[in-house]
Amino acid sequence: MSSGGKSGGKAASSSKTSKSRSAKADLTFPVGRVHRLLRKGNYAQRIGAGAPIYLAAVLEYLAVEILELSGNAARDNKKSRIVPRHLQLAIRNDEELNKLLGHVTIAQGGVLPNIHQNLLPRKSAKGAKGASQEL
C-alpha cells in the first residue's frame, strides 16, 4: 500500500519553482508589467513594492465589474458577444461607474433610452368613465 515516510527528500524541497507576483497575489493582471510601467512613466522617483500589486488589483476589479455588467446587458439583449453598446448601457446604468467614467465617451456606444415624462401620453380617468356609462 502506501508508505508512511516522506515522499520527497532534500532534492524535492530545494527545487522550489518560482511564482510570479501576480500568482502570489492571486491576480490575473500582470503585477510585473504594472511595476515596469510605473517606473517608466516617471510618476515618482521610487516605486514601493506594494504599489503595483495594489494598482493591478484595482484595475482587475474594475475590469471584472464592467465586464460582468456588460455581459448581463448583452444577455438581456439576447446576444452572446459584448459590443460597445453593452459597455455603454452597463456603465451608464450603474451609479458609481457612471460617476467614475462620467466624462468618458464610448465610441459606437449610443445613448440611453429616455423619454421625458411630459412627452408620455396621459392616463386620464375620462376614458374609463365614458366606457362604463355607454348603453
UniProtKB/Swiss-Prot annotation:
Protein name: Histone H2A
Keywords recorded for this protein, A-Z: Acetylation, Chromosome, DNA damage, DNA repair, DNA-binding, Methylation, Nucleosome core, Nucleus, Phosphoprotein
This protein's domain notes: The [ST]-Q motif constitutes a recognition sequence for kinases from the PI3/PI4-kinase family.
Main location: nucleus
Any GO BP: heterochromatin formation
One GO CC term, this protein: nucleus
Keyword Acetylation assigned: yes
Region (Disordered): 1-24
Listed PANTHER family: HISTONE H2A
Family in the record: Belongs to the histone H2A family.
Disulfide bridge positions per record: none
Assembly information from the UniProt record: The nucleosome is a histone octamer containing two molecules each of H2A, H2B, H3 and H4 assembled in one H3-H4 heterotetramer and two H2A-H2B heterodimers. The octamer wraps approximately 147 bp of DNA.
Sites of N6-acetyllysine modification: K6, K10
Comment field (misc): In contrast to vertebrates and insects, its C-terminus is not monoubiquitinated.
